[in-house]
Amino acid sequence: MSVEKQTAMRRTFAIISHPDAGKTTLTEKLLLFGGAIQLAGTIKSRKAARHATSDWMELEKQRGISVTTSVMQFPYKDYLINLLDTPGHADFTEDTYRTLTAVDSALMVIDAAKGVEPRTIKLMEVCRLRHTPIITFINKMDRDTRPSIELLDEIESILRIHCAPVTWPIGMGKYFKGIYHLIEDAIYLYQPGKHERVGESERIEGINNPELDKKLGDLASELRNEIELVKGASHPFEREGYLKGELTPIFFGSAINNFGVGELLDAFVKEAPPPQGRETNSRLVKPEEEKFSGFVFKIQANMDPGHRDRIAFLRIASGQYQKGMKAYHVRLKKEIQINNALTFMASKRENAEEAWPGDIIGLHNHGTIQIGDTFTQGERFKFTGIPNFASELFRLVRLKDPLKQKALLKGLTQLSEEGATQLFRPLDSNELILGAVGLLQFDVVAYRLENEYNVKCVYESVNVVTARWVICDDKAVLERFNQEQSRNLAYDGGGHLTYLAPSRVNLEITMEKWPEIQFSETREH
């Protein structure tokens, strides 16, 4: 099959939401509908030993939150779907941000009782920057919820995106009876209790069908009136607005009850864009080009605790990957052979014989691959737009056992390569300073150091409030700066010079004193 045909059948997307909106449940139900898993394990179920397929790391299983991005591929009808499940927890914004550079569209999950929440707003801003098309699933309709019209108003006013309802709920909570599909003019009736298998919903054709009155009684005429109102007050779905990220089609349902998910998935594969072209520092790379290219957006250490492994997740941008092929590693300026790239179904992995644009493959990484690296078949371009953010919180890392210094350094180096934390090594001392965007990341690092590297550490406070990458083309100025400011300078994990400011005032004074130097909050990988 040609590159064009392989590309056309693929859909690569991420699921975004505020914690506890039901994102992991929906992820699992999509896999269920795609036939990738037979049984949905109820997440956070204390009695059952089953855990959600996408929360595979031990810490995630314990806490019931996703803290790393999982990659899952599954077929659905005539399509192949690459689903990236992003962390919903506030402290893992960077991982989520970088994941959104690797997808062509997003699925936003909203809790019908809570509406738009802070994380949703933040993630939406990222999608807007990239004009990512978004489909919205309003979840938990089987519980008591806010009025649906109110939810649409809130999405439009807070997230600044037009809403186009495709399905509309009939009742809510214990009176939830189903959904009306505005485009198909069909009603799907809700049957509670069909948790684990994909049940066929009873379907009634046409909103004016007398059968509806038999099933719903007075609710049927209420529904007809409500739909008239909804049609008058909302935007009709049009694909162009959706693809530009200006309009979001809205679906209602209950993920835990498998209800409304099939309609969502059908619309998604039909309307969501196939893999798109990608910008580099020299040109736009189109997916249908013959030559292979791709970029690394994530590194994950110890996916398989039995093997001390590090996997680099690479999004294929063009051409075809074939087992054993040679690829050019642009940053290192060298050709490498890729024999054993992986494909993923959460933590299940298989060796990939071939892969195409939109697919995510895993490369075994022995410390030579970094986030943002580009691989090509000889061309020397670099994919752009994969950011690193300055840390906001800092801790000094101390060992409980001084003999484990080597293991500590190895663990911190490998974990910081994943991009959720940053390791700083000051010019003036042998201290190890860990930087993060949120407090939870420090817990995660301490937990993983102990479980994966057998190293116990403690944190101490350190006199650093913010970090800035130091950029300067004038070598003489940079040398003078290094000498004068060495007590506040460190190298990050990638060997980039960083200014660790003891206070905001100090940073402002230093920036004024050194106008030739750029103090950057973000750095391209």
Curated annotation (Swiss-Prot):
One GO MF term: translation release factor activity, codon specific
Subcellular location: Cytoplasm
UniProt cross-references to CDD domains, sorted A to Z: RF3, RF3_II, RF3_III
Keywords: Cytoplasm, GTP-binding, Nucleotide-binding, Protein biosynthesis
Binding site for GTP: 17-24, 85-89, 139-142
Signal peptide per UniProt: none
InterPro entries assigned: EF-G-like_DII, EFG_III/V, G_TR_CS, P-loop_NTPase, PrfC, RF3_C, RF3_dom_3_sf, RF3_GTP-bd
Protein's GO biological process: regulation of translational termination
Similarity comment text for this entry: Belongs to the TRAFAC class translation factor GTPase superfamily. Classic translation factor GTPase family. PrfC subfamily.
Record's protein name: Peptide chain release factor 3
Organism in which the protein naturally occurs: Coxiella burnetii (strain CbuG_Q212) (Coxiella burnetii (strain Q212))
Gene: prfC
